[in-house]
């Protein structure tokens, strides 16, 4: 029987004032270390684009579907360079809609042979974590290698994106080919907020889609429910075999 493993990242997209830290960075870091002692958890915090704090940042964490956020930024870059909007249509073929994976897109359009906009596909990937929509975007926008190359051109280093959703479904070991450190993941969130990665309407679309994300509401956003914090996040959940 397959077990489930979760890889979770979440960031506060700074649309509300950052709460003043009651303790110094060193004290906060020590508190966080104690909280996650003996657990496979990595933490990274960036405040005002410069002050950083990390815990267990020297591990390559498998991203699972978290890389769909990275993909969205690469898609935005290509659209920006081409001067086209997220309204650009993409034809969806029947063989794009694999039956053996999580895909609300396939459930809604089981026959394929239709066109949806890039923005609609991004809503499926970021909002619902649709695996087929992700691989359709890879087909159109250059595959994992293009996303990896774009992020490296921006200065990201401690990460890799090499596998599609179909690759990971066929071979669980391929899940480890898409990895990141906590700091690089949070740095990418900070770049989105600041406009360094994705600009204008592209940035606004991705940010708002992540804020309205429907997956993982019972995970990291849960403790902040009812507060003034505005949470934008992308979770990832994958399978593991009996050996872990």
Language model feature labels by segment:
Residues 218-244:
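Short, Gly/Ser/Thr-enriched beta-strand-loop segments that form substrate-interacting elements
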């Amino acid at each position: 029987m397959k077990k489930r493993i979760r890889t979770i990242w979440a960031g506060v997209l700074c649309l509300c004032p950052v709460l003043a830290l009651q303790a110094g960075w060193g004290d906060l870091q020590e508190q966080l270390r104690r909280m996650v002692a003996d657990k496979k958890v990595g933490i990274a915090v960036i405040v005002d684009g410069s002050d950083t704090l990390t815990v267990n940042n020297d591990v390559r964490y498998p991203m699972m579907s978290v890389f769909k956020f990275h993909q969205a930024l690469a898609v935005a870059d290509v659209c920006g360079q081409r001067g086209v909007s997220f309204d650009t249509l993409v034809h969806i073929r029947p063989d794009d809609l694999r039956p053996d994976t999580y895909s609300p897109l396939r459930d809604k359009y089981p026959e394929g042979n239709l066109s949806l906009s890039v923005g609609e596909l991004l809503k499926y990937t970021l909002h619902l974590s649709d695996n087929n929509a992700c691989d359709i975007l890879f087909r159109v926008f250059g595959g994992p290698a293009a996303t990896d190359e774009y992020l490296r051109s921006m200065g990201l280093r401690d990460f890799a994106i090499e596998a599609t959703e179909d690759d990971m479904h066929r071979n669980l070991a391929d899940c480890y080919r898409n990895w990141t450190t906590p700091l690089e993941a949070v740095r990418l969130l900070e770049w989105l907020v600041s406009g360094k990665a994705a600009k204008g309407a592209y940035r606004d679309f991705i940010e708002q889609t992540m804020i309205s994300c429907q997956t993982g509401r019972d995970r990291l956003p849960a403790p902040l429910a009812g507060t003034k914090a505005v949470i934008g996040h992308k979770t990832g959940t994958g399978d593991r075999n009996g050996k872990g």
